Amino acid sequence: MTIESCPGGRVGEDGITNPSNIRVLVVGVGIGGLAAAIECHRKGHSVILVDKIAQVDPLAGDGIGIGTNGARIIAKWGGGRVHDQILSHRCDTRKIEILNRQGESFGQHELKGYGRDHGYMLNRGQLVSILFDYAGTLGIDKRLGSPVTEYRETEMGAAVVLEGGEVIEADCVICSDGVHGAGRKFVTSLDPVSRESGWAMSRAYLRKEDLKPHRDRDVRILDGTDKQDRMMVWFDHGIQVSMWTVKHGEELVWIVTHKVSVDLSLLPPPTLGTKDARDTWTMEGSESMIEDTISQIHDWPSRNMIEPILRSTPPKRLLNQKIITREPLDRWVSPHGRMIIIGDAAHPYPPISGQGGSQAIEDAAVVAIALQLAGKDHVPLALRIAEKIRSVTSHYLMLQGHHMLKSTGSHPRATAIQTEASHLYELMFKPDWGVVAKNPSILAPPCPKWLFQHDSQAYVYAEFGKIAEAMADGREYVIANTPPSA
């Protein structure tokens, strides 16, 4: 089966193919869901996008990085216009400065994979807003304020029931509604199983004007940002502080990773239809939470470089989130092959991987192409091939998170990303500054070629037919896009 023989194989203006007659329903307007809707539209599929939220907030969330592997997909949208729009909202630094608790600098290291024409670091809400608006220019049917209450599937198609009783039918459903979404439960028949890491992240986004009451303090990170943004990271035993500016110092993002300081027994048990706050709580900010975060660095000599920014943060822009690890899933596709989960619903990564958004975009692109190549009569085959390709990477990334997570998952590409992350945790939270002084580059963020230079779209076009033939013959197909250590 080749692209020339499939219904949607002829490429038109702006890379959008002729109609495939495949009706796709996407659940979730996060990064993965929007990417799925856009990529499916570009591959000729008819798309409906639904989400329970009433509107998209461009100021929601903190910061996110999209690496080269995700950005190369976005760069094709709108003849490059979407890529250029994102660039105008990004952090344009090319360096990351490493410091210890005393504020001593251990040099600046190249921030690979996120520079101009390679990737971006920006506010998460701004990115979602840009993608949402672009989906609108394509004429994609977007239905906000539409909670999904039920999923249905037969051998011939899938459907969702919205609150109020409306039923939307499709040839397939792409679920990108998160780890606690109903789509994941329908596909896997499993409740999310998590493992405690003992760590939490306080994270926030704020604007330069929020700092005015504290301008008399040493806000060093703003120095020189009228010309170029900055990123600074402080490491100490048991804590890490990251800060970076956006749009030449007009906005700031900060993240403090620390030991869990919330008594989980005091959190309320879940009510019907809600997630367990004691499992994966994300608490909205308060003044007391800001004070608690500041207390994490109370004895740091460099506290005056950090505290003004933390104390200036509007509480509503602060989130405190427990870091957990999860076992990789064995299945992303529903029994009849008409539903697939992507993004966090399929593979919630530990934050340190820095690949959550990029991998969700890759998921979306692969599913859209697989549907294009398989055609309307072979939708289940398309989703199972997409699962085969993408789960390899995701398992590697998930298992990378912590040494405490020992898994025997069968998806080596994803497994490798998590292993790498656990090594980073060791370096970050148990730094040997004598060793770092001799070789500061050991704390530089990694940029493995197998990950950042991977072209997920080209890979599907090259390998789809081989995988389809192997499945038809009952042979095991060995995925080629695995990391060197897998």
Swiss-Prot record:
One of its GO terms (biological process) is biosynthetic process. Disruption phenotype: Blocks the production of protubonine B and leads to the accumulation of cyclo-L-Trp-L-Le. It is an enzyme of class 1 (oxidoreductase). One of its GO terms (molecular function) is FAD binding. Pathway: Secondary metabolite biosynthesis. Its EC number is 1.14.13.-. Coiled coil: none annotated. Keywords: FAD, Flavoprotein, Monooxygenase, NAD, NADP, Oxidoreductase. The active site is at 203. Pfam families: FAD_binding_2, FAD_binding_3. FAD binds at residues 51, 65, 124, 344, 357. Its cofactor is FAD. Belongs to the paxM FAD-dependent monooxygenase family. Flavin-dependent monooxygenase; part of the gene cluster that mediates the biosynthesis of protubonine B, a hydroxylated and diacetylated cyclo-L-Trp-L-Leu derivative. PboD is also able to accept other cyclodipeptides (CDPs) as substrates, including cyclo-L-Trp-L-Trp, cyclo-L-Trp-L-Tyr, cyclo-L-Trp-L-Phe, cyclo-L-Trp-L-Met, cyclo-L-Trp-L-Ala, cyclo-L-Trp-L-Pro and cyclo-L-Trp-Gly. This is Flavin-dependent monooxygenase pboD. It comes from Aspergillus ustus.
